[in-house]
């Protein structure tokens, strides 16, 4: 079994924040593969279902970003899932908006969510870095990551998020390069922006 975790902040007002791209990504996976309705467990929303022939769980920690590791460590321990079978989706300032990089292990690059996960589980989990771009100045970072995507950004984002969900089985098989290739080959055509309901 795999655990797919999205990182974000829990309040509804943060729903379309750049910092919440991890939540946005796993929400589409939940929708596309008709995962069960969520239940609160391990200080997070937990959903279960099948992706292809693989049993999977999606977790959205509700602890705020800097305590994400508490939730994920509890879930991994309970379900006996090793860090190698944990996929974490999160925002990456140092990647241009819409770019994706996937890696197993590595540093946290100052990301508070990853720092918390590293402290609780070590570094050997999969990281799906979703680029949100950089505001250009360090003093603008805090307000930038907590601001909403613009309408135009939501358009391209919606297409990217659908592509991630469509091709997630490739990554779940352990083929990170194949997953990134699939995303780069897919044309980013959009029918509508993300819902703000």
Model-predicted segments: where are they?
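Nucleotide and nucleotide-moiety/phosphate-recognizing core
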Residues: 2-105, 115-128, 135-140, 155-197
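Hydrophobic alpha-helical segments within soluble ligand-binding/sensing domains
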Residues: 109-113
């Amino acid at each position: 079994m795999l655990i797919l975790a999205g990182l974000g902040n829990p309040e509804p007002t943060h729903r379309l924040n750049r910092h919440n791209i991890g939540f946005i990504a796993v929400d589409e996976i939940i929708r596309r593969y008709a995962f069960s309705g969520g239940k609160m467990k391990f200080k997070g929303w937990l959903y279960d279902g099948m992706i292809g022939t693989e049993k999977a769980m999606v977790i959205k920690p509700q602890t705020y970003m800097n305590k994400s590791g508490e939730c994920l460590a509890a879930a991994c321990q309970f379900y006996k899932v090793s860090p190698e079978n944990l996929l974490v989706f999160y925002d990456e300032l140092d990647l241009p908006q819409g770019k994706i990089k996937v890696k197993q292990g590595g540093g946290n690059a100052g990301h508070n969510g990853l720092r918390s996960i590293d402290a609780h589980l070590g570094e050997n989990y999969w990281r799906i870095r979703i680029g949100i771009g950089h505001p250009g100045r360090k003093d603008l970072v805090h307000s930038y990551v907590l601001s909403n995507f613009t309408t135009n950004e939501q358009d391209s984002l919606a297409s990217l998020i659908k592509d991630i969900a469509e091709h997630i089985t490739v990554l779940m098989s352990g083929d990170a390069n194949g997953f990134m290739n699939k995303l780069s080959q897919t044309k980013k055509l959009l029918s509508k922006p993300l819902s703000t309901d």
